[in-house]
Amino acid sequence: MESLIVLINTIQRACTVVGDHGGDSNALSSLWEALPSVAVVGGQSSGKSSVLESIVGRDFLPRGSGIVTRRPLVLQLHKTENGTEDNAEFLHLTNKKFTNFSLVRKEIEDETDRITGKNKQISSIPIHLSIFSPNVVNLTLIDLPGLTKVAVEGQPETIVEDIESMVRSYVEKPNCLILAISPANQDIATSDAMKLAKEVDPIGDRTFGVLTKLDLMDKGTNALDVINGRSYKLKYPWVGIVNRSQADINKNVDMMVARRKEREYFETSPDYGHLATRMGSEYLAKLLSKLLESVIRSRIPSILSLINNNIEELERELDQLGRPIAIDAGAQLYTILGMCRAFEKIFKEHLDGGRPGGARIYGIFDYNLPTAIKKLPFDRHLSLQSVKRIVSESDGYQPHLIAPELGYRRLIEGSLNHFRGPAEASVNAIHLILKELVRKAIAETEELKRFPSLQIELVAAANSSLDKFREESMKSVLRLVDMESSYLTVDFFRKLHVESQNMSLSSPTSAIDQYGDGHFRKIASNVAAYIKMVAETLVNTIPKAVVHCQVRQAKLSLLNYFYAQISQSQGKRLGQLLDENPALMERRMQCAKRLELYKKARDEIDAAVWVR
């Protein structure tokens, strides 16, 4: 499941690039808010930063008095192979790796100031930081500003409410897991993190309770009532953490040494020794990673449903956006048609002009389709036990006399149904390749670069045609499979019958053996031979149908419907394609980017699920 966390990381970063980080004011639908995440919540001086650094095993977070975290920090941890060097990357600094983590701390401070200024303001725009290390687990955490009770000098009077509002906007989402940090040397009833968590998650289904500063509690006291859930019950077990002391921080005590000291503390503690295996920052990180993987897997269907609904809404909005009035309709139509022809030429070159597109399509037919058919579970369907059951069910109360024809037919039909999967997968794979070639051809058509609106229209029209071609192709390939089920090749079994009779004359079989396991194995062998023959046929006919319905049609009529529409358009419509006012163009481009994000996310999620 590790690849699912990586997938969500990728989508989160893509969301930020297009301006989707939740709570948008422009009323565009948000994918960010639907993605499972772990938000780290705690009051000032709760040990929140120390917990994060313990999980990472590095000093990298800004420290100081007052409000230090003033923007959400999306911290994506990537486990690497042992022996590789720790490094960090920021989304806003492409192709730059940090190996000095003191510079990471400074860049967080600088990037915060670039948006908020140096006057202690806060911003909901997140900073994305990826850390690659063999000492971490695959995990994504969102570090939020610490909850506070008073404003410091230079901050607006509303800072307390502003921070709580920002934190609440994250943790109130049903897909957000809450990592609530509370110091053990304070009454849990006064914990800012637990107070907010209880308001948004009253049952405690999404909340992880973390107790810090266990080693700083008054002598003779412990936190067992909290850890064991007697004081505050949550769905998940509480985890105790022992952070570095301020003296350790001042001395730059290595985080690996701190981890070892933490383990030793719990292992030797008279209060917590029996809980040592489920205490500490290392255990917390593994627990969060495992849970996040599970939550992502359970949420995939709802995320896909949301993506599909939002795609429909965005496509409707793109169709409805108004455009300015044009002047010379004839010249504009001529220009548009010329750009369309240039796009179609490049698209065809991708298919059969020595470009990689045609080779990728051939690869689907030459490798993917045969491989998928070879992996079909015919062995399970034609196992001795399965054959006996199906033949017996087909015979009913009267066993067959010579050959179980009904049993044969049911076995064959059941086997043939398995071919539908590879057939559908081939159609969808070609569809994705053609859509990608459309995007590439649009990007490579120089004439279109001045007109983002026309680019969007052409992509939408081409994809609409490709969707129709896919529907026809899907019908055709499934019809090929259904045809094999509708009428079996009788001569194949007649030849088998003659061969069987000849073998019987040369080596007579007793009546008892005729209905024993050998008899049913022979049936399975005959059906398997027939299925092999059908497979060889479909490996040849499915590519023919797909090329005829999808590839050939894409070359011949990709923009036919668009041409029919544009030729009947009046000057106003043509002007809308070539010239928009800035506000409408900005809105259209925002919608187009969000639509592209959703479609890419859907394809990537589908691909990840398909691989599984």
Swiss-Prot record:
The modification N-acetylmethionine is found at M1. Forms homodimer and may homooligomerize and heterooligomerize to form the phragmoplastin complex. Binds to PHIP1. Its main location: cytoplasm. Residues 32-301 form the Dynamin-type G domain. GTP binds at residues 45-50, 213-218, 243-246. It catalyses: GTP + H2O = GDP + phosphate + H(+). Its EC number is 3.6.5.-. Keywords: Acetylation, Cytoplasm, Cytoskeleton, GTP-binding, Hydrolase, Microtubule, Motor protein, Nucleotide-binding. It comes from Arabidopsis thaliana (Mouse-ear cress). Residues 520-612 form the GED domain. It comes from the Eukaryota. Belongs to the TRAFAC class dynamin-like GTPase superfamily. Dynamin/Fzo/YdjA family. Residues 143-146 are annotated as: G3 motif. Residues 212-215 are annotated as: G4 motif. Pfam families: Dynamin_M, Dynamin_N, GED. Residues 42-49 are annotated as: G1 motif. This is Phragmoplastin DRP1D. Putative microtubule-associated force-producing protein. Has a GTPase activity.
